[in-house]
């Protein structure tokens, strides 16, 4: 059991640390508010925010107003989404052109892929650059995937098109904890 003399230095140490921790917390808050004031004064071109002595409440109110008004204005992401879709469409067209330029590609495979690629139109609201699927690691697939011949096209994780015929395949699911 600890004696009373051992506990008191710990309490005294905590009492000394408490104001230091509080001072650091206030410094962080004030630094963040100052950065926010500068950002808002540049974004809103507000004269009252250019004054470094502006109240903290005023900075926070301007921030709320800025965020509310930015929700109402159409975002540049809508324009970016259209650019993404046109790029995606261009990529599909390039893939079709490349595939059709290969005379040695199996006719059934070429017809199937041409039909799939030409019929694909991404929904306008569903696709955006931030929604693109992330590539999955291929570590778990290296040993489990069968080697495909030159006239074989993998259509989905469970089906393969071989000379115009579907053949079922099974892949082991990659799990990072295994």
From Swiss-Prot:
Annotated InterPro entries: bHLH_dom (IPR011598), HES-7_bHLH-O (IPR032644), HES_HEY (IPR050370), HLH_DNA-bd_sf (IPR036638), Orange_dom (IPR003650)
The bHLH domain, residue ranges: 13-70
Coiled coil: none
Database matches in SUPFAM superfamilies: HLH, helix-loop-helix DNA-binding domain
GO terms classed as biological process: midbrain-hindbrain boundary development; negative regulation of DNA-templated transcription; negative regulation of transcription by RNA polymerase II
Domain of life, per lineage: Eukaryota
Chain location of the short sequence motif WRPW motif per the record: 174-177
Pfam families membership: Hairy_orange, HLH
Main location group: nucleus
Subcellular compartments: Nucleus
Notes concerning its domains: Has a particular type of basic domain which includes a helix-interrupting proline.
Protein's name according to its UniProt entry: Transcription factor HES-7.1
Organism of derivation: Xenopus tropicalis (Western clawed frog)
Phylogenetic lineage: Eukaryota, Metazoa, Chordata, Craniata, Vertebrata
